[in-house]
Structures are given as C-alpha cells and as structure tokens.
Amino acid sequence: MLLGSHVSMKGKEMLLGSAQQAAEFGANTFMIYTGAPQNTRRKPIEELNIPAAQALIAAKNLGPIVVHAPYIVNLGNTVKPENFKFAIEFLQQEVIRAEALGASQIVLHPGAHVGAGADAGIKQIIKGLNEILRPDQTAQIALETMAGKGTEVGRRFEEIAQMIDGVTLNDKLSVTFDTCHTSDAGYNIREDFDGVLNEFDHIIGLDRLKVIHLNDSKNPQGAHKDRHANIGFGEIGFDALHGVVTHPQLVDVPKIMETPYVGKDKKHNFAPYAYEIAMLKKGEFDPDLLTKIEQNEGRL
C-alpha cells in the first residue's frame, strides 16, 4: 500500500529532511509544502537540497512525492483582480518548483468565489488554469474535493468535472480525493465508500484520481466544516478508512494523512503518523493510540 503523510520541509535539510522524516514514520510516499502553507514566501530551487534528497528517496524507495500548494492562493476570486493575478503567477512558479523536486502531483484547493457565486468562481478557476498549465509540464495539478465551507467551490464532483472540462490542457489536471472533505460535503464515506467511488468514476473518472488525503472528520456527514480527526477517532471511523487504504481499485494511488498532532497544547504535541501508518498496516483499530502517541512523544 502507498501510505504516508504530510512532512515538513524546512531549515538547511529541506527536501532531505522531508524524506528522512517520511522514512522514520514508516511511510513509502509523502507530501510537502514548498514553504509555509499560510504564506507564499519560497526559497530558490537551488536551496532545496534536492540532490542529497534524491539519493535517500531512491535508497528508501520513497514516492510518489506530492506537493501541496498553499491555502491562501485563490484562483476563484473575481472580486479582487490583483489577487487572481498573483495566484496565477505564484502557481506558474509552483509547477516549476514541484517538477524540480520530482513531484508528480500538485494538490490545489480549487478556490472560493468570495460572494460572486459558484458559477463565477468556477469560470475564474478555469481561466486561471488555462493560463498556468504548460504543454510540456510533467507535474499534474490535482484539484482537491472540498468540504463546502464558506464560499469554497469543488464540494460536488460535478463542480470538479466542470472545471476539468473547461480547461484546454486538461491532461495536466487530476484530482485529490479528501475523505474528510468529501464526507463533510455530504457523501457517505463511512457506510458506502464503494457507492461514492462509483459516483466519482461516473462523473469525473477514476483515471483522474491521483492522490487521496486520508483523514477522519470531527464532524458528521454533510457538516461542511473541514475539521480533520485522527484515524478512527472521528465520524468516518477506522473500518471505512482502512477500506480506502486497501481498496483494490486504489492500489497505485498515494494515501496521504493530514491528521492532527496529538498533545495537551501547541508546545507539547507530536506527529501521529508513525502510529497511524503502523495501525493501518496492521488493520486493527487501537483505541489507546492517542495516549500512546503522547506518552512516547510520537516515537514508536
């Protein structure tokens, strides 16, 4: 199974540190932001420590590598033209960075219409993607299924399909399926994942599904909240999420966790991923998992 998590990329180690962290978690794939997800400040490509990282990635047989674009980039904005222009320019450079890092997929929250309406937002996203995509690019932009919080677009499979259909170079587009977002959007991941997957296949096509964000949800189906929970400790539950990980139609799709750190406060919290990966590989829910993570400071 292709199973991993978000890992950090920072300091002097950069991508090498990301690969080391993924290996320590017991992962065989991983996702990174090219800088802080809350801003768009980025280091030059030559400072990302790529050659040293590539050697470790090959030695540990890690991959595919997934890049996540920052949250604050909004291609759906028709209200502020300067924000839309900035989003295009940033994402053009993000594609170049992702390719240099060896990433095959760039996860992108499609955008929010900020009050102009979903149709206007979708048209603007299509316009932006048509400016960003290059015929020769190797990394795909993987539009993420959204929870429908606020004015987000992409909460329904039909909206994602509309974006893809409107883009000229849509062979450069794929989809990230987030289990928390999709449940929060109203799809029954907990009890009928096969049915949801069949609907996705009918509307978008399974050949477009290139990344899965494997997250439990703190809120019930249809809540439109987007609050991730640790695997098995939310409203979707362990059995359903383990079923996603082991699904025969999704063997070659990387499953990436973005579950919350565990601890009493922000100064004393620990990455859950080594434990969650081990639990999913074992196939048995551990109700004491969060206590163990905190007691052992995230180390197995």
From Swiss-Prot:
The keyword RNA-binding does not apply. It catalyses: Endonucleolytic cleavage to 5'-phosphooligonucleotide end-products. Zn(2+) 2 binds at E144, D178, H213, E258. Zn(2+) 3 binds at H181, D226, H228. InterPro entries: AP_endonuc_2 (IPR001719), AP_endonuc_F2_Zn_BS (IPR018246), Xyl_isomerase-like_sf (IPR036237), Xyl_isomerase-like_TIM-brl (IPR013022). Zn(2+) 1 binds at H68, H109, E144. Its cofactor is Zn(2+). Pfam families: AP_endonuc_2. It comes from the Bacteria. Keywords: DNA damage, DNA repair, Endonuclease, Hydrolase, Metal-binding, Nuclease, Zinc. Its EC number is 3.1.21.2. One of its GO terms (molecular function) is deoxyribonuclease IV (phage-T4-induced) activity. Binds 3 Zn(2+) ions. GO terms for biological process: base-excision repair. It is an enzyme of class 3 (hydrolase). Endonuclease IV plays a role in DNA repair. It cleaves phosphodiester bonds at apurinic or apyrimidinic (AP) sites, generating a 3'-hydroxyl group and a 5'-terminal sugar phosphate. Belongs to the AP endonuclease 2 family. This is Probable endonuclease 4. It comes from Latilactobacillus sakei subsp. sakei (strain 23K). The lineage of its organism: Bacteria, Bacillati, Bacillota, Bacilli, Lactobacillales.
